[in-house]
Design a protein with these regions (language model features):
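A cross-kingdom feature that marks ATP-driven nucleic-acid transaction machinery
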Residues: 1-124
Length: 124
């Protein structure tokens, strides 16, 4: 049985990694947030990129579950600003899905770097 604080501590570690990444990249205000609505839809981290927002779920589990991708998928359907979806998880192997990426915590900084270097979205 896992420790009851494993999930919250893992989530905190991933958010701290995102804050570190932003601050080390000379972004003074990390402008990171989360999403939660009245109907219970919750996404752990919204990370601004040149293309829009990367919606990220953070899960401490070592084996990826398909339902982990549901919240980011639903948010992307509701908000056109969501242009990337990811799951950070407690396993070891990155995994590409149809519309999302799963990365281990150790690979999260590399994913953030890739998101930060996307070309900017065209303006109308």
């Amino acid at each position: 049985m896992a420790h009851p604080l494993r999930g919250p501590l893992f989530e905190n570690a991933a958010v701290v990694e995102a804050v570190k990444h932003r601050l080390n990249g000379a972004v003074r205000l990390p402008n990171l947030t989360f999403f939660r609505d009245r109907r219970g839809l919750e996404v752990d981290l919204l990370y601004p990129t040149p293309q829009g927002l990367a919606a990220t779920e953070i899960k401490s589990g070592r084996t990826i579950a398909s339902d982990w991708f549901g919240p980011t998928r639903r948010l992307a359907q509701a908000l056109p600003e969501v242009t990337a979806q990811a799951v950070v998880y407690g396993g070891d192997e990155p995994q590409a899905r149809r519309d999302a990426t799963a990365v281990p915590l150790a690979g999260f900084a590399d994913l953030l770097t890739a998101l930060d270097t996307l070309p900017a979205a065209p303006t109308a």
